[in-house]
C-alpha cells in the first residue's frame, strides 16, 4: 500500500490483516503515523490523498455477526477511496455452505479485498491461505479484533503522544478484544494489566505470545482483583460481559462479572487523569456506569471515530 498525503509517505504493510501478531512494531508505528496524517488532512479540509485509490475496484464484506462501527466505517472508507461495496447475503455460517477456501478462490476473480467478521478465526485463516491476491481483513473473530486494537492504540497516542512508562488496565473477560489489545500494547512498549474472574482469563497461549513479543520495558500482568489491576494506571478499558453468541449465558455471566464493573470508585484508584476506554457497544449499568461512560476522561467516542481513519489504511 502506498499513500501520498501532502508529502509522499510510502507505507508497505503485510497483504492481510488477520492478527496484530502478523505486524511488526515498525508496521504498527507506520500505520499510526499515516493515520495521523490522514486525520489531519480531513480536519483541515484537504483532499484525501487516498481518493480514488480503489476506483473501478470492488470490496466484499462477509459479516456473520451484527456490526455498527465496523460496518459503517469500512463502508465509508471504501466509498471515499472510490470503490464499490459487495455484500453477499450469508444464508449459512461462513464456510459451512461451502469451504472457506472455495469462497476465497471465487471472490478473488471479482474483488480486490474482503472484510470478514466471523465466529471462527480458523475459517478466516483458511480463507486467507487460499488466496494470494485478495487483501483479507479480520473485522472480528472469536479470538481477535485487530482493527479495534489499532484504533485503541491510535487513540492512546493522540492523548499521550508517547507510550513510554504508560500502563493500561483491561477489566473483564479475557476475550478477543483483550487479546488484540495486549498484542498491540506490548509491541509498542506499554505495560498491560488484565483482571478477569476465574475461568474467564486470557488463554495461556495468548499470555505466552504477549510475553514473547513484548518490547523491552513492556510486560503483561494478570490479576483476579480489579482494584489491584487499576492501581495508578494511565487508562482503564472494559468490554461487554456477554459477547455475540453468548446470550444464553448472560445471566450467569452478570453474576460473575459484577465485581468487575468499572465505576467511579474503581476509576478513582487509577491516576487522576486516567482515561476510560470501551470498544462499544456498551451495556450501561453492567460493565460500566453512566458516570464513567459520560465523564470528561472517557474517550470511547474518540475510539469509535478513529475506526474510520484506520479503515482507510486497512483497505
Descriptions of predicted regions:
Residues 273-274, 282-310:
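Rossmann-like dinucleotide-binding domain for NAD(H)/NADP(H)
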Residues 54-59, 164-166, 273:
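Phosphate-coordination loops involved in phosphoryl transfer and adenosine-cofactor binding
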Residues 123-141, 248-270, 296-297:
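A short, gly/pro- and small-residue-rich
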Residues 2-72, 76:
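Positively charged, low-complexity intrinsically disordered leader regions
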Residues 211-290:
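Rossmann-like adenosine-cofactor binding region
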Residues 313-315:
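Conserved small/polar residues in nucleotide/adenosyl-binding loops
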Residues 46-157, 284:
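Phosphate/diphosphate ligand-binding glycine-rich loop within oxidoreductases
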Residues 64-73, 160-232:
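Glycine-rich phosphate/diphosphate-binding loop of Rossmann-like nucleotide-binding domains
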Amino acid at each position: 500500500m502506498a499513500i501520498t498525503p501532502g508529502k509522499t509517505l510510502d507505507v508497505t504493510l503485510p497483504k492481510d490483516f488477520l492478527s496484530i501478531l502478523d505486524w511488526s512494531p515498525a508496521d504498527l508505528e507506520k500505520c499510526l503515523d499515516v493515520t495521523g496524517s490522514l486525520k489531519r488532512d480531513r480536519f483541515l479540509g484537504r483532499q484525501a490523498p487516498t481518493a480514488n485509490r480503489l476506483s473501478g475496484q470492488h470490496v466484499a464484506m462477509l459479516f456473520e455477526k451484527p456490526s455498527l462501527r465496523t460496518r459503517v466505517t469500512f463502508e465509508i472508507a471504501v466509498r471515499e477511496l472510490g470503490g464499490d461495496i459487495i455484500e453477499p447475503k450469508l444464508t449459512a455460517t461462513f464456510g459451512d455452505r461451502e469451504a472457506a477456501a472455495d469462497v476465497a478462490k471465487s471472490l478473488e476473480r471479482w474483488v480486490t479485498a474482503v472484510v470478514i467478521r466471523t465466529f471462527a478465526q480458523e475459517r478466516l485463516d483458511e480463507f486467507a491461505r487460499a488466496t494470494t491476491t485478495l487483501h483479507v481483513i479480520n473485522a472480528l473473530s472469536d479470538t481477535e479484533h485487530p482493527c479495534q486494537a489499532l484504533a485503541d492504540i491510535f487513540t492512546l497516542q493522540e492523548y499521550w503522544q508517547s507510550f513510554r512508562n504508560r500502563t493500561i488496565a483491561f477489566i473483564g473477560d479475557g476475550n478477543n478484544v483483550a487479546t488484540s489489545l495486549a498484542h498491540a500494547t506490548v509491541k509498542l512498549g506499554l505495560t498491560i494489566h488484565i483482571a478477569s474472574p476465574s475461568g474467564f482469563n486470557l488463554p495461556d497461549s495468548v499470555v505466552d505470545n504477549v510475553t514473547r513479543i513484548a518490547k523491552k520495558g513492556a510486560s503483561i500482568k494478570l490479576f483476579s482483583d480489579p482494584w489491584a489491576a487499576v492501581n495508578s494506571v494511565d487508562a482503564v478499558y472494559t468490554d461487554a460481559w456477554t459477547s455475540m453468541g453468548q446470550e444464553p449465558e448472560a445471566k450467569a455471566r452478570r453474576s460473575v462479572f459484577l465485581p468487575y464493573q468499572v465505576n467511579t470508585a474503581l476509576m478513582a484508584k487509577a491516576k487522576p487523569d486516567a482515561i476510560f476506554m470501551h470498544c462499544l457497544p456498551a451495556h450501561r449499568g453492567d460493565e460500566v456506569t453512566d458516570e464513567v461512560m459520560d465523564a470528561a476522561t472517557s474517550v470511547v467516542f474518540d475510539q469509535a471515530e478513529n475506526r474510520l481513519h484506520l479503515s482507510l489504511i486497512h483497505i
